[in-house]
């Protein structure tokens, strides 16, 4: 996928000046040229930023199983923590604050 992003960036390095030249050399009014150039640059910059993110491996991390997807990792850790809390809740519900099943909670160890 990195080769595709690199090819896209190189294409935009060539295409953007050509499109800008064509817009500037058109017989339109100055206002129309400015509007077209503004829209063109916004579109080009968004595509270039997405391609740069792809090159840096920070775009669309959900496709990587167990990779850099921070939200999935946080959700897994939260489930582990909640599972651990549920275990300690069931252990301490027997009366002992330390979780021993053979004491009644009145005696301290």
Swiss-Prot record:
InterPro entries: DUF5480 (IPR035148). Pfam families: DUF5480. This is Gene 4.2 protein. It comes from Enterobacteria phage T3. The lineage of its organism: Viruses, Duplodnaviria, Heunggongvirae, Uroviricota, Caudoviricetes.
